[in-house]
Structures are given as structure tokens and as C-alpha cells.
Design a protein with these regions (language model features):
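Short glycine/serine/threonine-biased micro-segments
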Residues: 22, 42, 46, 50, ...
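Small-residue faces within membrane-embedded alpha-helices
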Residues: 13, 17, 21, 52, ...
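Interfacial aromatic-anchored transmembrane helix boundaries in multi-pass membrane proteins
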Residues: 21-35, 58-99
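Hydrophobic transmembrane alpha-helices of multi-pass, membrane-embedded glycosylation machinery
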Residues: 38-40, 61-62, 171-173
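Hydrophobic transmembrane alpha-helices
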Residues: 1-54
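Membrane-embedded alpha-helical hairpins and interfacial helices in multi-pass inner-membrane proteins
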Residues: 29, 34, 71-77, 97-177
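Hydrophobic alpha-helical transmembrane segments
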Residues: 10-15, 38, 53-57, 79-84, ...
Length: 177
């Protein structure tokens, strides 16, 4: 039975990764709105820590490396930040599985999902924004200046993901839990 469970989880992980990449490409022309993060989090929440991390790393690598708007392979520190962030998102979903993967979703769960969406996106945005000035050797004041110059863009991304997590995850979890 163990091999059957492993195969089932492999297929589910592949489906989550494919969904994350497809939704990433489908929405890439809409600024500040993306569904990769929520799909990776759901993979961790549904399949556990290891599979969530695998889905996060694989889906972000495929999305970034093959992005028609510009491949992340051109700048290794950026793609490393993107992949690391999504691995962490999958890990977070998996580690919170015992607490949040329940059929009965309360208002506290909804708030927690929204908060997690905001915080995980903040981490992603921070790591990706800081990847360039740090790798390019900017000094600390220049690095802070570059980081602050992107806050308008990143805060909208964080708010939109907070809303997406709060609205979307409860609807999905009640069918998967």
C-alpha cells in the first residue's frame, strides 16, 4: 500500500506543479496578481512538507526559467531567491497542515490564511527585490533605497495574495480535507 500512496502523492504533486505553472503563465500580464504562491501553499497543506517543498521548487523553476517575458536563468541570484521562497511556501503549508487542513473553517482560519498569504508574499518580494542589489555589490544605503523604491509594487502584490489566500484556500480545503 505504501507504493500506491507514494505514486498517488507523486501524481498529485505533478498536478499541483502543472497548475501552478499554468496559472502563472495565464496571469503573468496582470501586475500584482498571481496564483503560484497559493497553489504551492495548497500543495504543502494537502500533501505535506516534502511534497509541498518539491512542488514549490519545481514549479517556480519551470515558471521562471521558461518565462517568455525573461528567463530567470539570466540572473542566478534572482532565480535562487524565487525558488527558495517557493520552497519555503510549500514547507509552510506542510508544517501548518495539522492546524489548517480541516473541513470546518472558522473566521480565525480565514484570517490566518489571509495573514499567511501576506507574510509569505512579503518574504518572496523581499528576497527577490534584494537579490539584485546584494549580488551587484551595492552598499547598505543603496540596497535600502532600491528595496524602498519597490514598495508600491510589492505591497499591492502582498495585499492581493492576502485576499487570494483568505478567499481561495477555505473553498479548496473544504473539498480536499
Amino acid at each position: 500500500m505504501k507504493n500506491h500512496d507514494n505514486l498517488t502523492n507523486l501524481v498529485r504533486a505533478a498536478m499541483f506543479a502543472a497548475l501552478a505553472v499554468a496559472l502563472g503563465y495565464a496571469l503573468m500580464l496582470i501586475p500584482n496578481v498571481e496564483l503560484i504562491t497559493v497553489v504551492v501553499f495548497l500543495a504543502g497543506l494537502t500533501l505535506g512538507i516534502q511534497w509541498g517543498m518539491c512542488v514549490g521548487g519545481l514549479s517556480e523553476f519551470i515558471f521562471s526559467a521558461l518565462n517568455p517575458l525573461g528567463s530567470g536563468l539570466i540572473f542566478p541570484p534572482l532565480i535562487a531567491a524565487q525558488i527558495s521562497s517557493m520552497i519555503f511556501v510549500g514547507f509552510t503549508g506542510g508544517i501548518l497542515r495539522p492546524f489548517l487542513f480541516k473541513k470546518n473553517i472558522t473566521k480565525i482560519h480565514i484570517f490566518a490564511f489571509g495573514f499567511l498569504g501576506f507574510v509569505l508574499t512579503f518574504i518572496f518580494d523581499s528576497l527577490t527585490t534584494l537579490s539584485y542589489p546584494i549580488a551587484a555589490g551595492f552598499d547598505w544605503p543603496q540596497t535600502i533605497g532600491i528595496y524602498l523604491s519597490g514598495i508600491g509594487f510589492t505591497i499591492l502584490h502582498q495585499i492581493s495574495n492576502g485576499i487570494i489566500f483568505a478567499v481561495g484556500i477555505p473553498r479548496v480545503v473544504k473539498y480536499l480535507a
